[in-house]
A protein has these predicted regions:
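Flexible "arm" and connector segments at domain edges
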Residues: 1-164
Length: 164
C-alpha cells in the first residue's frame, strides 16, 4: 500500500505541474507509461545524468526516487522499476489506488474526522490489512467495484464489532 501513497503524491505533483488540468495530466502519464517498452524504459535521467535502473537494487531506486522528489522531478521509468521490484503491475497499482480511495471515504463516513473511527478493527489488525484481503476477494472488472468494496468493508467493520 505504500507504493499507492507514493503514486498519489506523484499524481498530485503531476496535477500541479499541469495547473490542475486533469486531461493534460492524464495524457502526460499515459504517454510515459506507453513509452515503457523501449530501451530507455530502463533508465532514469536527472540533470543530464543517466541512471541505469537494471544495475540498481530496490533501496537505491527508492533513494533515487526521493532525490527526484527533492528536485520536483518525476520519472515514470523509475517508478515502474520500483513497481517491478515489488512484483506489482500497473493494474495492481490501479486496483490498490481505488481501494485506498474507497477506504479514505469509508474512514470519513465512519467518524475519522470526529475521532470515533477505529483504525484497528475487531481483530486488532489495521483497516489497510482488511482492505488488502477484501481486494483479493473482489473482481475489479465489475462496473460497481467501488460500491462492492465499500459494502464489504462496512460488513467487516460493523458486524465484527468495530463500529461504535
Amino acid at each position: 500500500m505504500e507504493l499507492v501513497d507514493i503514486w498519489h503524491f506523484l499524481l498530485s505533483a503531476i496535477l500541479i505541474e499541469a495547473r490542475g488540468d486533469i486531461k493534460a495530466a492524464a495524457e502526460w502519464v499515459e504517454k510515459r507509461i506507453a513509452a515503457l517498452d523501449g530501451q530507455e524504459a530502463r533508465k532514469a535521467w536527472i540533470f543530464e545524468k543517466e541512471y541505469r535502473l537494471d544495475n540498481m537494487d530496490p533501496i537505491e531506486k527508492l533513494e533515487l526516487l526521493i532525490g527526484f522528489s527533492v528536485f520536483r522531478k518525476i520519472s515514470i521509468p523509475l517508478f515502474d522499476a520500483i513497481l517491478e521490484d515489488c512484483q506489482m503491475s500497473w493494474q495492481d497499482l490501479f486496483r490498490q489506488y481505488i481501494g485506498k480511495n474507497v477506504l479514505n471515504f469509508f474512514r470519513q463516513d465512519f467518524g475519522y474526522k470526529a475521532g470515533s473511527y477505529r483504525k484497528h478493527w475487531h481483530d486488532g489488525r489495521e483497516d489497510n490489512v482488511h482492505l488488502v484481503e477484501i481486494l483479493a476477494e473482489l473482481n475489479d472488472d465489475s462496473d460497481n467495484f467501488k460500491e462492492k468494496l465499500y459494502a464489504a468493508m462496512q460488513v467487516r467493520y460493523e458486524i465484527r464489532g468495530s463500529a461504535q
